[in-house]
Amino acid sequence: LPGFVRERWHADFVVNHGTVMRPAECPGLVARLDGERVGLLTYHVDAQGLEVVSLDSLREGVGVGHALLDAAEAEARRQGCRRFWLVTTNDNLRALGIYQRRGMRLVALRAGAMDEARRTLKPELAEIGNDGIPLRDELELELQLD
């Protein structure tokens, strides 16, 4: 798992909302297709709810991410969490659509959060993200669980 995290995130940690988080030390859910690992979601549970720490799909367009999010939401409900949430970046347009179609709402914009993380915590963060979009901001999405 640490090697997978390092390969996908270019370090053994991710930075969400200014906090260093280590996916390999978090509980996780693995997606398999025909016996092959095709996805990983890691999460953290606290008083705020279940936060998705990392989500990686190695096969786009076949429902890996959806299945992992479904399983994580079910885990949040099982643990009695009232909130299922995550942080993504401003360049992650496809995922933003997926999250919102799932009923998640945008609840926070952290303008400049990626610039700050690059400057203070993770200098290896790319400056340009998906589709040539400058990687600058974080967006927080949540689903209230009742």
Regions found by a protein language model. Name each.
Residues 2-60, 66-70, 79, 136, ...:
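Acetyl-CoA-dependent GNAT
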Residues 12, 106-107:
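Short secondary-structure junctions
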Residues 57, 86-96, 107-118:
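Conserved beta-strand-loop-alpha-helix junction that forms the acyl-donor binding cleft
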Residues 62-74, 93, 97-101:
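Conserved acetyl-CoA-binding loop-helix of GNAT-fold acetyltransferases
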Residues 91, 112-146:
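C-terminal "cap" of GNAT-fold acetyltransferases
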Residues 76-88, 98:
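Conserved GNAT acetyl-CoA-binding A-motif
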